[in-house]
Amino acid sequence: MTRDLRLVPVAVGTWAVALACVLWPVLTGFAAIGSWCAAGAALACAFVTRRGALTAVACAAAAIAASSVWFALPARDAAADALDGRVTAVVVTVTTKVEPTIGGVRFSGSAQIDGATARVSVRLTGGEAPDGLDLGARVSVTGGGEPTDPGESAAVIVFARSAEVVRRPPHVFGLASALRHGFVDEVIRGLPDPGGGLLPGLSVGETSAVSDELDAQMKASSLSHLTAVSGSNCSLVVGLAYGACALCGLGRRTRIVVATAVLAGFVVLVTPEASVIRAAAMSAIGMFALLLGRRGAGIAVLALAVTVLVIADPWISTSFGFLLSASATGALLLLAEPLARGLGRWMPRALALGIAVPLSAQLVCGPIIVLFAPEVALYGVVANMIAGPGAPLATVLGLVACLAQPVPPLALGAAALAWLPSAWIAQTAETFAALPAARLGWSQGWLGFTLLTLVGAACVIVACRLRPRWLRRVATTALAVLVGTGTGMVTLSGVAGPLTAPRDWSIALCDVGQGDAILLRSAGHTAIVDTGPDVRALETCLSRLGVDDIDVAFLTHFDADHVTGVPALAGRAHTIIHGPASEPGELAD
């Protein structure tokens, strides 16, 4: 099968230029002018030689992305200067999900500052969010501002202790907010956890009911993409809408219009996360191609969607969520079929395809994940094979329950049915997270990225029997050594390790590198003082000592070598007591 990869260099080049411009703003002018000059030269050559038109398109796309950053910088700088270190009132139009934090909420939006529109991130502390604070609302916040680092989507962070909703979400935003909150507060109330807590995320993107313990289990089993609505849900909803219109005998144009409208409503309902935006752009481009009577190749549609989104918002190029979403989609489009053919030599076709889909995503996304979380979910492929089929059922039935709220019996019945696959996914996560060495430690940073990329390449070479033969032999040998070494390490750390730990300890000092993590145990109760800077090291220490339940955690102060390991306490610590924050951002984050 041939694939049209011509637009891939365009997307990669545009992404690279946008990323460089937002991380190093001083380069923006040079990048914009240079890209425009290159585009002009390539276009002139194309007219003369009838070749190189794609090069001109790639240079023009990069030039537009760089120019977009260039034109946005003055407003961002003005907003940062106006709010830096000052306590002032800012009216913000909410453009993202409102997420809970310790002692408050956080959200982002656009604001008029000194006559210019800039993106602002708000950390609201000191109480619950005011009623009506949701996507599309306009809220007045009072607090101190702090400029962000280059590459951050927002130009400035406002640390606020008070907020007033001056306009509730209007029109379709208000309807979506009412449906979303009604679903969480009324429809699924009473459904047993953890399935009941996971269902809102699978259906409408509302993750507030997901416990820390379940969140940690989903990450450990490589199922975190099922915690909330992902890009695949967009494709599912659009496909169902288009198919329903076809069954009703509607024409192609009507089907496309209805499917596109349903897509827009779904994005508003679940709030525009990075993976949802990517999938929505791909679906919209696919609908447009269908309207023109053309079939869009999957990888070409992905490349075009990435290019358009990066041009529209160059700061999305720094989003790990967007990178993971695009990478996973590309892996499914490029690797799943060859892997399925290769695995099909040893197993039935259906089983080979079932393994190839999560394996391809894991091979591509794994190296990216170790850049910020140096660990590998050892059972991720198997967990996804088992839990994956439940996600579409939970999504569709959950959406039916959400939209059927005016008819309570129907809504409650659909929610009860949706709970079954949701509970199945949660139970799968719990089971695999509890297995020995569920998260295998890996090298951090670019070294870990390179090593895991080589491992993934070796897997593809062996499974797909790529030539030449000597390359397959090298890859096979490398994988055999890796599997043997990994098995030995898992045996030593997962089985022999806990046997060497003392059982009657009262005070234990975890080896977390620079910093402290001190465990205290008395009368059946356990406490920890500080967490150190290394999440993985603390998790290893807690697992080795058999500490699954911590009554109280004390954080003496907010230096990185004392609190960076806090995520290791997720699902373990019941209470956290901390010292005073020297800066407002420490407590807000």
Task: Give residue ranges: language-model regions.
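N-terminal leader/targeting segments
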Residues: 1-78, 278
